[in-house]
Regions:
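ATP-dependent helicase/translocase motor core
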Residues: 1-94, 101, 105-116, 134-137, ...
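Conserved helicase ATPase motor motifs in RecA-like P-loop NTPase domains
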Residues: 68-69, 171-173, 185-204, 235
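Conserved helicase motor
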Residues: 97-100, 120-129, 143-148
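SF2 helicase catalytic motif II
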Residues: 156-192
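Interdomain helical connector at the RecA1-RecA2 junction of SF1/SF2 helicase-like NTPases
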Residues: 204-306
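Conserved RecA-like ASCE P-loop NTPase motor core of nucleic-acid helicases/translocases
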Residues: 66-67, 91-99, 296-310
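Conserved nucleotide-binding/hydrolysis micro-motifs of P-loop NTPases
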Residues: 100-102, 144-147, 171-172, 196-201, ...
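Short glycine-/polar-rich loops that comprise or flank the Walker A/P-loop
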Residues: 89-91, 136, 161-162, 186-190, ...
């Protein structure tokens, strides 16, 4: 079945011409099957909604891809942006990342994929010029810079153009005011998100905007899934073991009350909890990693100390 599918003329031609990438070290990267499928789902959604103008500018024109951490989301999402920019009728493709993710190495990688697409400056002036330039069909920007541009340019011509906006790591940072700004100003848009940790109703927690609490509410349908279970099965990521440790004990003197949610960040970062978790890790490190006595925390410290004195 693999050879019949892989070596089919149209499949092999697509892989060679559309789904291969050279990185900054001139290394040839061939996209994996799940990456190709996710890309095709997005391109198909763009094509369908372009032929149905009622879908443009709505959630039905977009969607999100759930690919686990370590499965190559950034390559998939950027290659999707590159191919989308080549589609007839698409004016602009914006590949949006968080500021903290746009380091020098990442910029080199993006620039390798699309020369001149990425701008690492803090100024929105370059972004404004890129958006106004009809020859600049694909660009990489940050969430923060795009938000600043929208705030300063209320009547920009790009808002009326056919735009594809792709978010890499579409977690909570895209919710709220940023999402509202995009959907309010852009008229003919497709909104796509890539995430390894989608937010569902049962893990959404509290938020100011009840209509944007989940990933689906912000981006639309789930277009493709490749979870950690799939990645471990395919040996694309290392397997791991999870031990659940009880950190909260019920007390009889407290009466249960129904609340919408708790202050999770405060609970997670409480000094007492952090201290207990840290001590547990140190105390059980050798046991969990199956190290010998000589490599225990105490043994390592003593041996290192002696070697320094020697």
């Amino acid at each position: 079945p693999f050879t019949a599918t892989f070596f089919a003329k149209h499949a092999l031609l697509n892989i060679l011409t559309r789904y291969c990438v050279f990185d900054v070290e001139e290394k040839l990267l061939v996209m994996r099957p799940y990456q190709i499928v996710a890309t095709e789902r997005i391109l198909n959604r763009i094509l369908v909604s372009e032929n149905n103008k009622d879908m443009l500018g709505t959630l039905r024109a977009g969607g999100y891809v759930w690919h686990t951490t370590g499965s190559g989301k950034t390559l998939t999402s950027f290659k999707t942006a590159q191919l989308a920019s080549q589609m007839e009728g698409v004016d602009k493709v914006m590949f949006v990342v968080d500021r903290k993710d746009l380091d020098y190495q990442t910029m080199r990688e993006y620039d390798r994929f699309e020369k001149g697409a990425v701008d690492g400056s803090e100024s929105t002036a370059v972004l404004a010029r890129q958006l106004a330039n009809p020859d600049c069909r694909i660009l990489v920007t940050t969430i923060q810079k795009l938000a600043c541009f929208i705030k300063k340019n209320k009547g920009h011509e790009v808002y009326a153009q056919h735009c594809v906006i792709i978010f890499d790591e579409c977690h909570r940072s895209q919710f709220g005011e940023m999402h509202v700004s995009i959907t309010k100003h852009f008229k003919n848009y497709h909104l796509f998100g890539f995430t390894g940790t989608p937010i569902f109703a049962d893990n959404a927690g509290s938020g100011r905007n009840f209509n944007l609490r989940t990933t689906e509410q912000a981006f639309g349908d789930k277009l493709h899934t490749y979870t950690i279970v799939d990645a471990i099965r395919d040996e694309n990521v290392l397997p791991f073991r999870v031990d659940y440790i009880q950190t909260i004990r019920e007390r009889d003197q407290y009466e249960d009350q129904k609340v919408y949610d708790i202050y999770r960040e405060g609970a997670y970062k409480a000094a007492a909890r952090v201290d207990l978790v840290t001590n547990y890790i140190l105390d059980h490190f050798a046991q969990k990693t199956k190290r010998s006595h000589g490599y225990s925390f105490k043994g390592t410290r003593v041996m290192g100390f002696n070697s320094i004195l020697a």
